[in-house]
Amino acid sequence: MRSTNLIFFSYQNTAFFRPLWHTRFIRKRGNLMEQFFEDIKDLEVTTVARAQEAIDQKETATFFIGRKTCPYCRKFAAKLATVVVETKAHIYFINSEEPSQLDALQAFRSTYGIPTVPGFLHVEAGDVTVRCDSSMSEEEIKAFAHL
């Protein structure tokens, strides 16, 4: 019989045994979320109101809508980070898990046809272009955002 490495922990006076791989999974997931914050550190965190203002004022701006808990957002953020470092582009980030933004974000996503995250928007002269595709290459990201 094969032995399984178990760890013991307690939570609210209840004892649990979990396989050792479980803690590695939790640790890895935490590291991935930390990496997400590292990847978006050069983006300007903003609000839905700012995105709508850019559209209304016919500015040129690019927005990434995402969340740390989304594996597709983390994948996209890593590529976007490389593009931002290379091009020195100014890109905004809207956190789709921000509680104060949920209603506004839902309305914004409905208005501009953003079905899921990661959402990537480019605004130019009042025209809004949207892509929700974590498989975009760095070259596709540059082309989409006119970088």
What name fits each language-model region?
Residues T4, H22, R27-A61, L147:
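N-terminal leader/targeting and pre-domain segments
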Residues Y11, F16-H22:
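Short, positively charged and aromatic/hydrophobic N-terminal segments
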Residues R50-T87:
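Local sequence-structure signature of Cys/Sec-based thiol-disulfide redox active-site neighborhoods
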Residues I65, A89-A104:
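Thiol-based oxidoreductase modules, predominantly thioredoxin-like and allied folds used
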Residues P99-V117:
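Short Fe-S-cluster ligation motifs
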Residues T116, L121-L147:
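Non-catalytic, surface beta->alpha helical segment in thiol-disulfide oxidoreductase systems
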